[in-house]
A protein has these predicted regions:
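N-terminal acidic, proline/glycine-rich, low-complexity intrinsically disordered segments
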Residues: 1-14
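Basic, flexible Lys/Arg- and Gly-enriched helix-loop patches that mediate nucleic-acid binding at interfaces
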Residues: 17, 21, 25-267
Length: 267
């Protein structure tokens, strides 16, 4: 499925209004995938809302388990029946991963009141997804959206060493010395914090760089370039693992089975 970024009136519904259907009889709605999860995790797993929002619903006494209120850390048991605002918790949506060719100007925060937030796109999709990682507002390229927490951990955890390839335009010709510095790893300081980039693959042609990272430090490439006297003009992510970005700017669609294999081949 492919979708366009066009917010609709229906996106103004609350999460509970949008996701919870008619009242259901008091029967088990906690499949094996929910058993052992904390209550707020189980609600988030259903796709109804985020963990933080689920904890808020619980604290506002809008959640019942088997007809009784429970704390957010309550562990789901086989046979539990969960209700939110008197309605049955919806079944968890199938685990999916989508590709989004993020344009410059879209912020990866999920603030629903920010017109430039990716939240405006997420509200138009047929299921609840969240960004796997982020790209700066001034950057573009391949961004993954998913509802699969296990996949998110595999792709985002620092120990997993996932490759991410970027095409970077800088403000001047790149010297051999600068190229070697970037490849070997550079350091930069923000306030009292000192950061260090790991050795990485870097290629240069005139003022264009190709950089392959396995780290995910905040605004890492911009700080790396600044550390060697270069200013980033454009930054575009073209690959995650073996998954290459070939779609037009703004395209948002679910990955094919073959693309999932490319994405997870090294995870």
């Amino acid at each position: 499925m492919t979708t366009a970024f066009s917010p609709s009136a229906s996106s103004t519904k609350t999460l509970v209004e949008a996701a919870v259907g008619e009242e259901a009889p008091l029967i088990n709605n906690s499949p094996a995938t929910l058993v052992g999860l904390r209550l707020n995790q189980a609600i988030a797993h259903s796709g109804l809302c985020s963990r933080k929002a689920a904890a808020r619903l619980i604290s506002e006494q809008r959640v019942l388990v088997n007809g009784q209120q429970q704390p957010h850390h309550y562990l789901i048991k086989t046979g539990d029946f969960i209700q939110v605002d008197g309605k049955a918790l919806p079944e968890a949506a199938p685990r999916q991963c989508w590709l989004y060719h993020k344009p410059v100007g879209i912020d990866c925060n999920v603030k629903s009141d920010d017109p430039n937030s990716i939240a405006q796109l997420l509200a138009t999709l047929p299921l609840r997804l969240f960004p796997l990682g982020r790209l700066d507002k001034d950057s573009s390229g391949l961004l993954l959206l998913s509802n699969d927490g296990a996949l998110a951990h595999r792709l985002m955890h620092a120990d997993q060493l996932q490759q991410k390839e970027y095409r970077v335009e800088v403000d001047k010709l790149v010297t051999e010395a600068q190229l070697q510095q970037l490849a070997a790893g550079v350091s930069w300081q923000l306030g009292t914090m000192l950061y260090q980039s790991d050795p990485c693959l870097v290629q240069a042609e005139n003022n264009l760089l190709t950089i392959v990272l396995t780290q995910g430090l905040n605004r890492q490439i911009r700080y790396m370039c600044r550390a060697v006297g270069l200013k980033v003009l454009t930054l575009h992510r073209v690959r995650i693992n073996q998954l290459q970005l070939t779609d037009d700017v703004g395209c948002c669609r679910s990955l094919t089975a073959d693309e999932m294999l490319l994405l997870t081949s090294h995870s």
